[in-house]
């Protein structure tokens, strides 16, 4: 799909090109109080009051998400006009904008429209500029057009015909909007990769498959990939990671992916992604109901790989290292048992009270490995705890960090990217729940504050650098009729790196 930018100040009569240029459709916003947006006012004048008449007749009440096509419109180059309800003007925020553009795309994709002129990006949204609106609109469109068909013997072809979108933006934002197009497309491509990896079944998306995916990203985008096998992992004394992997016939992999966009001496940001390609719970076996969704337990790994692809396509001037410990968590005759004690790469001994709390066991060795890069910051991403889903539901990812500056950066990025996160507590008092009578630390801390104690466990391995943890158990995938991976938190991570790179 082709996206282009055209500057236009509708209030200064600069709309001639939009009014006379050929297009299948022009998209206009209408607020609930029957208020026309700047673009709608110009189109209304050009069509001799058609828009006003339609609104006054009650055919378009402006309620959020409502759409109405006007056909064979005279006075403008577009053959159709799509009116989109924006809701109340004083409540028009990021969510309202996203709802409006999503409704617009759904209406457009249900037609045979090929080219559309899109004016909604110029709407005032929480003091955001129109380049923000462009990026959010492209991501919403790519979200609507994403389909996972790789495993279908006869995949259905795309039903829409949309091929070209022209965004009208404020002239002062034209340069930034062109950059926003590039970043949005790269980000959408990274999210699609993340979704594809999550949606693949566990018999396809194995640890080896993830390793090969990392190698392909490196080959396609000029990165450096290292994929360590069992013997190399053993040589690194990653006893905690290996305690999870040991019962599976699928060999574990330890993936390290390097992107260098800045000077070699510049400290990198390290992203660590949990890569459990299927999680049965091990000996602490999960219930059978919905266990198929445990193929999504590698979505942390998928989001890190998707972010690396997006960063490379954007060409960000920053150094980034991705680390992905990946294996299956299976029961078996040689599986780790509840009560076993294992030794981590750091040397801390861990009493494994529950083998279904395995994500932290593979991440802790990866966090120790990250020390060698002398990182500027480390962010781990994991579908870590059901407790986080209970606490936050499926809207916000859980953010844990003792570093206020780093947490602030990530929260700012989450708001800018429209990829919400909520900061959770990480007080020292919670650490007491991880005490063990027999080892340095237990891998669980009981039912109370389960998401917090999981983060506390990880914090024991992050003394030498600024660190944050994102628990995406509630946001990485959806169940029900819309079942599938979401691609989150790639937007948050990418925006954080864009901000760090100053781009």
Swiss-Prot record:
Belongs to the peptidase M17 family. It is an enzyme of class 3 (hydrolase). The lineage of its organism: Bacteria, Pseudomonadati, Pseudomonadota, Betaproteobacteria, Burkholderiales. GO terms for molecular function: manganese ion binding; metalloaminopeptidase activity. Its main location: cytoplasm. Mn(2+) 2 binds at residues 274, 279, 297, 358. This is Probable cytosol aminopeptidase. It catalyses: Release of an N-terminal amino acid, Xaa-|-Yaa-, in which Xaa is preferably Leu, but may be other amino acids including Pro although not Arg or Lys, and Yaa may be Pro. Amino acid amides and methyl esters are also readily hydrolyzed, but rates on arylamides are exceedingly low; Release of an N-terminal amino acid, preferentially leucine, but not glutamic or aspartic acids. Binds 2 manganese ions per subunit. NCBIfam families: PRK00913.1-2 (NF002073), PRK00913.1-4 (NF002074), PRK00913.2-4 (NF002077). SUPFAM superfamilies: Macro domain-like (SSF52949), Zn-dependent exopeptidases (SSF53187). HAMAP family: Cytosol_peptidase_M17 (MF_00181). GO terms for biological process: proteolysis. Pfam families: Peptidase_M17, Peptidase_M17_N.
